[in-house]
């Protein structure tokens, strides 16, 4: 039985003061015992969040890490070893905003995945299609390519210690959400692609849906057989809304 996971991606939001307020709200949440919960603040606030959530059953992750595992001469980047030292347990890899706006290639994403894993972090591999790709009927082809690039580089066994998040790009920050049936179709295809290489790995890997996840739609999405939780964006900046999504995963 796969344990649900709800992870909040705070993106490029927050000040020292607003993060303190959000931590206070998160500490007051009654969270379901059967769900893993994590938040991913901007790097600047990771230590503040780790300290502020000490003793609360909420993990802390990062939104990005470097292609090299150890610290060194790579100006502006954060090594996964540094993130682990700061108290992070997981890290997003290949988020669509980084692929599309910053030009991260499948090769770079694979390198970041491997570097993170080598430092004991759980990579959360983000895959998903644009609106144009969906309208062209290429959704499954695009997702298979993004997933396959990591399988080809690192082997399917790497996914025994990883999470995959399907995030339809057209639904991120737009208020649009893939229907439960649309999301399930892609999640089933992801699991089938992994199962073609290793059935046990496919059975155990957690697949998250990310794309304007809200409390109102969460329960129906999480009720799908291959959706094991959510990668939550804007809604994770509101403690009460985020808590409601976590409870939906526990139901």
From Swiss-Prot:
- UniProt keyword terms in alphabetical order: Cytoplasm, Gluconeogenesis, Glycolysis, Isomerase
The biological pathway it contributes to is: Carbohydrate biosynthesis; gluconeogenesis; Carbohydrate degradation; glycolysis; D-glyceraldehyde 3-phosphate from glycerone phosphate: step 1/1
Active-site residues (renumbered): 95, 167
What does the UniProt record say this protein does? Involved in the gluconeogenesis. Catalyzes stereospecifically the conversion of dihydroxyacetone phosphate (DHAP) to D-glyceraldehyde-3-phosphate (G3P).
Per the UniProt record, the lineage of the source organism begins with: Bacteria, Pseudomonadati, Pseudomonadota, Gammaproteobacteria, Pseudomonadales
The protein's annotated catalytic reaction(s) are: D-glyceraldehyde 3-phosphate = dihydroxyacetone phosphate
Name of this chain's protein = Triosephosphate isomerase
A GO MF annotation of the entry reads:
triose-phosphate isomerase activity
- Entry's Gene Ontology BP terms: gluconeogenesis; glyceraldehyde-3-phosphate biosynthetic process; glycerol catabolic process; glycolytic process
Q: Which family does it belong to?
A: Belongs to the triosephosphate isomerase family.
InterPro entries (alphabetical): Aldolase_TIM, TIM_sf, TrioseP_Isoase_bac/euk, Triosephosphate_isomerase, Triosephosphate_isomerase_AS
Q: Which gene encodes it?
A: tpiA
Q: Which residues bind substrate?
A: 9-11, 173, 212, 233-234
């Amino acid at each position: 039985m796969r344990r649900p996971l709800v992870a909040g991606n705070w993106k490029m939001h927050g000040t020292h003061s607003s993060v303190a307020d959000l931590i206070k709200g998160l500490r007051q949440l009654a969270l379901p015992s059967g769900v893993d919960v994590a938040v991913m603040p901007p790097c600047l606030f990771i230590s503040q969040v780790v300290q502020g959530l000490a003793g609360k059953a909420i993990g802390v992750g990062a939104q990005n890490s470097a292609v090299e595992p150890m610290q060194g001469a790579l100006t502006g980047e954060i090594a996964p070893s540094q993130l682990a030292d700061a108290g992070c347990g997981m890290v997003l890899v290949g988020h669509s905003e980084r692929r599309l706006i910053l030009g991260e290639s499948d090769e770079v994403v694979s390198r970041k995945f491997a570097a993170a894993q080598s430092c004991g972090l759980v990579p959360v591999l983000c895959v998903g299609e644009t609106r144009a790709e969906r309208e062209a009927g290429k959704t499954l082809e695009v997702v298979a390519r993004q997933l396959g690039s990591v399988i080809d580089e690192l082997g399917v066994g790497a996914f025994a210690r990883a999470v995959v998040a399907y995030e339809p790009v057209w639904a991120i920050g737009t208020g649009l959400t893939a229907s439960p049936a649309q999301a399930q179709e892609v999640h089933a295809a992801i699991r089938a692609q992994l199962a073609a290489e290793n059935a046990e790995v496919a059975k155990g890997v957690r697949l998250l849906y990310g794309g304007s996840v809200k409390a109102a739609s969460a329960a129906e999405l999480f009720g799908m057989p291959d959706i094991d939780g959510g990668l939550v964006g804007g809604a994770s900046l509101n403690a009460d809304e985020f808590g409601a999504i976590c409870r939906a995963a526990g139901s």
